[in-house]
C-alpha cells in the first residue's frame, strides 16, 4: 500500500492510538510487535479505516484452526459414541500401537487400509484378521475404527453377541430394538465385527436360536455387501476353519 502523509486524514476521523501501536513517520499507526500497518488508506487518499496487522491476522487464523480442531474433536467423540465402541478401546491409535515382528505385517495392512479409506469404501473392500486369544486382533481393528472415525466416516464397532443381546433387550423395551440396530449396522460406512464366529459355537445345543442368529448375521452382511459398504472382521478362526463350522 502507498504510505502517505496522513496527518490531515486523522484530523477528520476519530482514530485513537492503542497501547500496542505507534505512529510511523507518515503518521500511520503500526503494530509494536510486527510493525505492519493497522490502517488502510485508499489510493486517492480520501478514506482511511482500521485494518488488521500481520500478527492480528495470524492470531485470528490460529483461533480458527483451534476452533476447527475443537469442533472436529467434538464430532469425533460424537461419532465414537454412536459407533457403540466401549471405553476400553476408545483410545486405540495406530500411531501408539506396539509393533512387533509378530504383528508388523498386520499393522502395515491396517495403516494402508486407513490411508486409502476412500478407495476401500468405494470398492467395498473389507478386512479379516484372525488369531488366537490375546493375539491383538481386537486391538488392531479398534485402532482402524478410531482412525476412520477421525477421518469423518460413520463406523459401528461391536460383536454379534452384543447385537443379539441388544435385539433381545429391544423386545422387552430395554434395548435399541431390532430395526434400529440392524439399520445402524447396514447403513454405516464401515462395520467392525469382533470375535466373528463365536456365535456358531454350541449351535448343536440350541439349533433354533443358532438359526435365528445366523439369519440376522447374514441379513446384515448381505445388506452391506449389496450396498457396497465394507465390513472388517476379527476372529479366532481362519476362513477355512470358519467355513467348516457353518
Residue locations for each model-derived region?
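Short metal-coordination and nucleic-acid-contact micro-motifs, chiefly zinc-binding Cys/His arrays
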Residues: 24-30, 47-51, 90
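Interdomain "pre-motor" coupling segment immediately N-terminal to P-loop NTPase/helicase cores
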Residues: 35-85
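Conserved alpha-helical scaffold flanking the Walker A/P-loop in AAA+ ATPase domains
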Residues: 114-118, 170-191, 196, 215-223
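Walker A/P-loop nucleotide-binding motif
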Residues: 121-141
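N-terminal pre-Walker A segment at the start of P-loop NTPase domains
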Residues: 94-120
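Loop/turn-to-beta-strand initiation segments
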Residues: 153-154, 187-190, 227-233
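Short glycine-rich substrate-engagement loop in P-loop NTPases that contacts/grips substrate
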Residues: 104-111, 145-187, 204-207
Amino acid at each position: 500500500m502507498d504510505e502517505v502523509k496522513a496527518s490531515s486524514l486523522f484530523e477528520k476521523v476519530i482514530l485513537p492510538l492503542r497501547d500496542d501501536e505507534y505512529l510511523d513517520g507518515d503518521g500511520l499507526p503500526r503494530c509494536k510487535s510486527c510493525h505492519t500497518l493497522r490502517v488502510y488508506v485508499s489510493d486517492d487518499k480520501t478514506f482511511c479505516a482500521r485494518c488488521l496487522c500481520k500478527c492480528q491476522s495470524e492470531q485470528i487464523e490460529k483461533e480458527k484452526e483451534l476452533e476447527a480442531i475443537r469442533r472436529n474433536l467434538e464430532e469425533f467423540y460424537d461419532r465414537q459414541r454412536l459407533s457403540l465402541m466401549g471405553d476400553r478401546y476408545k483410545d486405540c491409535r495406530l500411531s501408539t500401537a506396539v509393533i512387533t515382528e509378530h504383528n508388523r505385517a498386520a499393522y502395515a495392512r491396517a495403516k494402508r487400509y486407513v490411508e486409502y479409506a476412500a478407495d476401500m469404501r468405494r470398492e467395498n473392500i473389507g478386512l479379516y484378521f484372525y488369531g488366537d486369544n490375546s493375539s491383538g486382533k481386537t486391538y488392531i481393528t479398534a485402532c482402524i475404527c478410531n482412525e476412520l472415525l477421525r477421518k469423518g466416516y460413520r463406523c459401528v464397532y461391536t460383536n454379534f453377541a452384543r447385537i443379539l443381546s441388544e435385539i433381545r433387550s429391544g423386545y422387552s423395551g430395554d434395548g435399541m430394538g431390532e430395526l434400529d440396530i440392524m439399520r445402524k449396522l447396514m447403513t454405516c460406512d464401515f462395520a467392525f465385527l469382533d470375535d466373528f464366529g463365536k456365535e456358531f459355537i454350541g449351535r448343536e445345543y440350541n439349533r433354533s436360536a443358532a438359526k435365528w442368529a445366523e439369519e440376522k448375521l447374514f441379513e446384515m452382511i448381505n445388506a452391506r455387501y449389496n450396498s457396497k459398504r465394507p465390513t472388517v472382521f476379527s476372529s479366532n478362526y481362519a476362513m477355512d476353519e470358519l467355513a467348516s463350522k457353518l
